[in-house]
From Swiss-Prot:
It comes from Arabidopsis thaliana (Mouse-ear cress). The gene is CSLA11. It is found in: Golgi apparatus membrane. GO terms for molecular function: glucomannan 4-beta-mannosyltransferase activity. It is an enzyme of class 2 (transferase). This is Probable glucomannan 4-beta-mannosyltransferase 11. Belongs to the glycosyltransferase 2 family. Plant cellulose synthase-like A subfamily.
Length: 443
C-alpha cells in the first residue's frame, strides 16, 4: 500500500470497521480507540460501533467515546437498535443495512475486547486487493492476559493449537476454514453473494464462512498478523464460552449438511472436507471420543479385567496432540500434561453442548456474553472487582466434582486390585477434575 500513497487517497478502497458490543464497560474504550488509530486515509475509513448495551450509563459512555473520536476527524458511527434479536448476528445484520455500508468494499470486524495494531489494515487488505478470488483474510489472536492464571495459560495453548493445526492447515490445503468471528477482513461482495449474516445459530461467523466457501470463494489465514485480545479468566465464563463454541457448530452441522451435499459450486473433495473433517471430526466426534473414552470407558475398564484396551490407543492421540501443542506454544511445554488433562475436563462441557446442538435442546441458542476485565488486568484493580459473599461455595462446580470422585475411585480400585499402572493416569485426571470442581483453576 505504501507504493500507492503517491496516487492519492482515492486509490485506497473504502473500509468499514465494525465493533459489536453489549454492556462492555471494561473494554469499549480499548477497542474503539484501537479501531480509530488504524492507519488508513480518514476519508476511506468508517468505524461503526454496534452498541446493543442495555445499561444507560454504559450507553452514554460509549456515545461520549464515539463523540471524542469524531472531533478528531474520524468518521465514526454509533448505531443502536431497540431489541437484541439475534444477538451479535442480529446487530451485524442491522449494521449492514445502513446506506453508507454500500460505499465500502471491505469490512473488518473486531469484538469489543480486540485491539488491532495500527498497521492491521495495511497488512491485510492488500491480500484482498491483489487476489480477487479471496473473500476473507483472518489474523491470529494474541492474548494480553495469557499469564494471568493457570486457566488462561491452558486457553492460550488450546487456541495456539487451533490456529496452527486447524486455521493455518485449512488455509494452506483447502483455502477454507471457519471464520473466528473477529480479527478478520471480509470482501463485502462475497458476504452479499452468500446471503449475509444469519442468526439461526450462535456461531454466525462459522455459518457465514461455510456459505461463502460453498460459493467458491477462498480464505487465507495470515499467521504473522496478530490482534490483541482478552481470555476469560473466570471458569464460569469460560464454560459458557465453550458451551457456545461446541453447541453452535453442532447445530449448524445439523442445519447445513444437506445444503453442503447439494451444492454444485465446489468440488466433491471440498464438500467431503467440510462435512467430514471440518464438522464431523473436529466439531463432534473429537468431543465425544475425548470425554467418553478418557473419562468414562478407560476408568470403568479397571472393574473388568477381561477388557484389554491396547496401550497404543490410550497414548497415541494425547502424544500427537501434545507434540503439536509443544510446537504451537513452546514456552508452555512444561504444562502440556496438565493441558491434556484439562482438555479432558472441558470435553465434558463440550460434549454436553454438542448433544444440545445436534438435538436442538433448550439451551441451543443460549448466548452469554463472556465477562471481561479490560484495564483491570494491567492496572491491578482486580481486588475491586465484585466477588460473591460466599466465594468458596460459589466456586464449587458439582459436575466436575462428581466425575473427579468417580475417576478417583476407579484409580484407587486399580491401585489395589489391578495389574496395570493405569491408576497413575487416573489419579492425575481425577485431580484435574477436582481442581476444576473446587474452582481453583481461574481467578
Amino acid at each position: 500500500m505504501q507504493e500507492d500513497l503517491e496516487l492519492g487517497n482515492q486509490n485506497f478502497p473504502m473500509v468499514l470497521v465494525q465493533i459489536p458490543m453489549y454492556n462492555e464497560r471494561e473494554v469499549f474504550k480499548l477497542s474503539i480507540g484501537a479501531a480509530c488509530r488504524l492507519i488508513w486515509p480518514l476519508d476511506r475509513l468508517i468505524v461503526q460501533v454496534l452498541d446493543d448495551s442495555t445499561d444507560p450509563t454504559i450507553m452514554e459512555m460509549v456515545s461520549t467515546e464515539c463523540g471524542k473520536w469524531a472531533t478528531k476527524g474520524i468518521n465514526i458511527k454509533c448505531e443502536r437498535r431497540d431489541n437484541r434479536n439475534g444477538y451479535k448476528a442480529g446487530a451485524l445484520k442491522q449494521g449492514m443495512r445502513h446506506s453508507y455500508v454500500k460505499t465500502c468494499t471491505y469490512i473488518a470486524i473486531f469484538d469489543a475486547d480486540f485491539q488491532p495494531e495500527p498497521d492491521y489494515l495495511e497488512r491485510t487488505v492488500p491480500f484482498l486487493i491483489h487476489n480477487p478470488e479471496l473473500a476473507l483474510v483472518q489474523a491470529r489472536w494474541k492474548f494480553v492476559n495469557a499469564k494471568k492464571c493457570l486457566m488462561t495459560r491452558m486457553q492460550e495453548m488450546s487456541l495456539n493449537y487451533h490456529f496452527t493445526a486447524e486455521q493455518e492447515s485449512g488455509s494452506t490445503r483447502h483455502a477454507f476454514f471457519g471464520f473466528n468471528g473477529t480479527a478478520g477482513v471480509w470482501r463485502l461482495a462475497a458476504m452479499e453473494e452468500a446471503g449475509g449474516w444469519k442468526d439461526r445459530t450462535t456461531v454466525e461467523d462459522m455459518d457465514l464462512a461455510v456459505r461463502v466457501g460453498l460459493h467458491g470463494w477462498k480464505f487465507v489465514f495470515v499467521n504473522d498478523v496478530s490482534v490483541k485480545s482478552e481470555l476469560p479468566s473466570q471458569f464460569k465464563a469460560f464454560r459458557f464460552q465453550q458451551h457456545r463454541w461446541s453447541c453452535g457448530p453442532a447445530n449448524l452441522f445439523r442445519k447445513m449438511t444437506m445444503e453442503i451435499i447439494r451444492n454444485k459450486r465446489v468440488t466433491i473433495w471440498k464438500k467431503l472436507y467440510v462435512i467430514y473433517s471440518f464438522f464431523f471430526v473436529r466439531k463432534i466426534i473429537v468431543h465425544f471420543f475425548t470425554f467418553f473414552f478418557y473419562c468414562f470407558i478407560l476408568p470403568t475398564s479397571v472393574f473388568f479385567p477381561e477388557v484389554n484396551i491396547p496401550t497404543w490407543s490410550t497414548v497415541y492421540f494425547p502424544f500427537m496432540i501434545t507434540l503439536f501443542n509443544a510446537i504451537a506454544t513452546p514456552r508452555s511445554f512444561y504444562l502440556v500434561i496438565f493441558w491434556v488433562l484439562f482438555e479432558n475436563v472441558m470435553a465434558m462441557h463440550r460434549t454436553k453442548g454438542t448433544f444440545i446442538g445436534l438435538l436442538e435442546g433448550g439451551r441451543v441458542n443460549e448466548w452469554v456474553v463472556t465477562e471481561k476485565l479490560g484495564d483491570a488486568l494491567e492496572t491491578k484493580l482486580l481486588p475491586q472487582v465484585r466477588k460473591p459473599r460466599n466465594g468458596f461455595l460459589e466456586r464449587i462446580n458439582s459436575k466436575e466434582m462428581m466425575v473427579g470422585i468417580y475417576i478417583l475411585c476407579c484409580a484407587s480400585y486399580n491401585l489395589v486390585f489391578g495389574k496395570t499402572v493405569l491408576y497413575i493416569y487416573l489419579y492425575m485426571q481425577a485431580l484435574a477434575f477436582i481442581i476444576a470442581g473446587i474452582g481453583f483453576i481461574g481467578t
